[in-house]
Amino acid sequence: GNHNFSSSSGDTYKLALYTSSKTVSASAVTGYNTTNEAANASGSGYTAAGNTLTNNGVTGSSSTAICFADFADTSFTTVSTTARYALIYQSSGGAATAGLATDSAVCVLDFGGDFTTTAGTLTIQFPAADTSNAVIRISG
């Protein structure tokens, strides 16, 4: 595979925030860039390129033939921003050698509307890490 989600020897992944002006079609989002990235109006809680995610690794289920990757929740503290989308992307590892662009996209999260935080904490809480709910699931 092009992305290595192993918690011990896998690639490094980040989560960046974007405004509702970002075009998020599969052909438009191939990797991280600063176009329409959420700006930090005040405070120091969000910087360009976002947060590094803690990768909890890959788990599988032999009964359902579904594997899933999981990340720990991540927070931006003392942040003032408005975001609609989050991009999970591979920030280091095998992307270039696997033929992918540097900072290649894994997935886009849509918050369903603008989410505004003013001098507060914005937490991205990942769903239950299981075969029905995990953000990244692969069946075989």
Question: Which ranges hold each PLM region?
Answer:
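Small cysteine-rich, disulfide-bonded extracellular modules of the LU/uPAR three-finger superfamily
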Residues: 1-84, 91-140
